């Protein structure tokens, strides 16, 4: 029912970009058509409806959300083809996630694990998070064993390696290369038993792939995670505040927006941690509000709920990782 299918580059990589693709229908029209069709088959597609509900809690990322539906559609139709005795491509579902810190990469990985478990693509759907230190050992053979152990824990689920390019930073003699070689071998030997997601900054991930040309073809799905706009960051802040049963005063809201505009314009994108940055500001502001109330003698419901301008933590919070 969706007009736009997943598009492929010449090298077979699924091209999932979250900005500005032309479509036959407008996004609103396509979504309306899609929802109408889904409503007719609600019982059949209950898994997708549940995932969509969880994705609706994520601010922005509209293209990513549509593409998750496309991956669902592709798997679902392949299952129907298999039932009819038609050929079904046994394509691996290993992925690359490219984006700056705090843009939702880990959250989306968890959702994909849940979706694939419900669709019987993965037997467990759990997420194992790892970084260089979890894979690279201290002597010859140690790295391969650590990597194999991590893959074993990931069987039936997703192995999510953050800042994956750090595995290639030490040169030919670095044990990181041994980790890469071990991952590649198991991606082939056990390609339908687990899903490997490599994540990190876009530029570094592209450079990492250029140094390891054989890797790119092994990751058929690549998803870009753009930075949040100030408007989206404010929406994230309001949702965090609401979830905790607080509210921002008008002055606090203005101050936070001005602060986010300043930080966004003066901080390098790779050092700004997006949603995590906002969360840190909100959590510190809640503690500051508690200190302010402790020094006073009023504990009305409105006092306990309101974050005032002076409560806002607006020191430099701009660093963070994936």
From Swiss-Prot:
Keywords recorded for this protein, A-Z: ATP-binding, Nucleotide-binding, Sporulation
Disulfide bonds: none
SMART domains in the record: AAA
Binding-site list for ATP: 99-106
Origin superkingdom: Bacteria
SUPFAM superfamilies, per the entry: P-loop containing nucleoside triphosphate hydrolases
GO process terms (BP): sporulation resulting in formation of a cellular spore
GO molecular function, one term: ATP hydrolysis activity
PANTHER family listed in its UniProt record: AAA-TYPE ATPASE FAMILY PROTEIN / ANKYRIN REPEAT FAMILY PROTEIN, AAA-TYPE ATPASE FAMILY PROTEIN _ ANKYRIN REPEAT FAMILY PROTEIN
Family indicated by similarity: Belongs to the CbxX/CfxQ family.
Protein name, entry field: Stage V sporulation protein K
Name of encoding gene: spoVK
């Amino acid at each position: 029912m969706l007009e736009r299918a997943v598009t492929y580059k010449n090298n077979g990589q699924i091209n999932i970009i979250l900005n500005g693709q032309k479509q036959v229908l407008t996004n609103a029209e396509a979504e309306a058509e899609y929802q109408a069709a889904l409503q007719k088959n609600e019982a059949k597609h209950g898994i997708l409806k549940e995932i969509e509900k969880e994705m609706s809690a994520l601010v922005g990322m509209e293209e990513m959300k549509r593409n998750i539906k496309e991956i669902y559609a592709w798997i679902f139709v392949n299952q129907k083809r298999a039932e009819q005795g038609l050929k079904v491509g046994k394509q691996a579902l290993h992925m690359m996630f490219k984006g700056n810190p705090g843009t939702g990469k880990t959250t989306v990985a968890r959702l994909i694990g849940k979706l694939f478990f419900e669709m019987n693509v993965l037997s467990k759907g759990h997420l194992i998070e790892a970084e260089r230190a979890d894979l690279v050992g201290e002597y010859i053979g140690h790295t391969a064993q650590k990597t194999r152990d991590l893959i074993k824990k990931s069987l039936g689920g997703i192995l999510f390696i953050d800042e994956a390019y750090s595995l290639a930073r030490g040169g030919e003699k670095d044990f990181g290369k041994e980790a890469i070689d071990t991952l590649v071998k198991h991606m082939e030997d056990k390609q339908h038993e687990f899903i490997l997601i490599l994540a990190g900054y876009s530029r570094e991930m592209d450079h990492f792939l250029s140094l390891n040309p054989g890797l790119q073809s092994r990751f058929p799905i690549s998803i870009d995670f753009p930075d949040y706009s100030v408007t989206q960051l404010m929406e994230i802040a309001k949702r965090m505040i609401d979830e905790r049963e607080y509210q921002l005063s008008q002055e606090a809201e203005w101050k936070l927006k001005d602060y986010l505009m300043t930080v966004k314009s003066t901080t390098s994108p790779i050092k700004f941690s997006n949603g995590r940055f906002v969360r840190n500001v909100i959590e510190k502001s809640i503690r500051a509000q508690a200190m302010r109330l402790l020094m006073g003698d009023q504990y009305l419901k409105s006092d306990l709920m309101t974050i005032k301008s002076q409560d806002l933590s607006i020191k430099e919070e701009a660093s963070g990782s994936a």
